[in-house]
């Protein structure tokens, strides 16, 4: 869904930047308005798992600064929205304001979000986003029933 949205906006003349660890499979071409920025995740010997969320936030900061982006539109509350919130905070220390739109797709709420370990991060990421959208009314209801969400969630089916 995110890839198709980006490609459609690019056709209308908007510059679209995909920031992720792998080029989206549906993004089988790049054009003058479509860009892909790879997130390079390095192993950190102290930890068993690479710090993807930190690498993603750092890459978001770099791309926002270099490309002068107007906004970050992220898909999924974790890890993308939480990484975007961290990037926004880092950018604020540099005098850069970047709004965040978070689109909820389902598994970030109904599967990952139900894990008690992640609940506070999901709640924080959603509430700190400037705009929140969901792909269905049922997902909007589930989000409000599972988390203490203070933000309006707009449904875009």
Predicted regions and their residues:
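Hydrophobic residues at beta-strand termini and immediately following loops
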Residues: 37-39, 156
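A short beta-strand/loop micro-motif in the catalytic core of glycosyltransferases
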Residues: 128-136
């Amino acid at each position: 869904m995110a890839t198709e949205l980006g490609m459609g906006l690019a056709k209308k003349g908007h510059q679209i930047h995909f920031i992720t660890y792998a080029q989206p499979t549906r993004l089988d071409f790049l054009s003058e308005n479509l860009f892909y920025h790879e997130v390079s995740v390095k192993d950190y010997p102290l930890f068993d798992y690479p710090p993807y969320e930190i690498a993603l936030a750092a890459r978001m900061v770099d791309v926002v600064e270099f490309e002068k982006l107007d906004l970050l539109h992220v898909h999924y509350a974790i890890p993308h929205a939480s990484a975007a919130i961290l990037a926004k905070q880092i950018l604020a220390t540099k005098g850069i304001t970047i709004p965040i739109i978070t689109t909820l797709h389902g598994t970030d709420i109904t599967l990952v979000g139900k894990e008690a370990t992640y609940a506070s991060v999901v709640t924080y990421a959603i509430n700190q986003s400037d705009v929140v959208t969901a792909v269905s009314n049922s997902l909007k209801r589930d989000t409000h029933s599972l988390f203490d969400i203070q933000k309006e969630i707009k449904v875009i089916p």
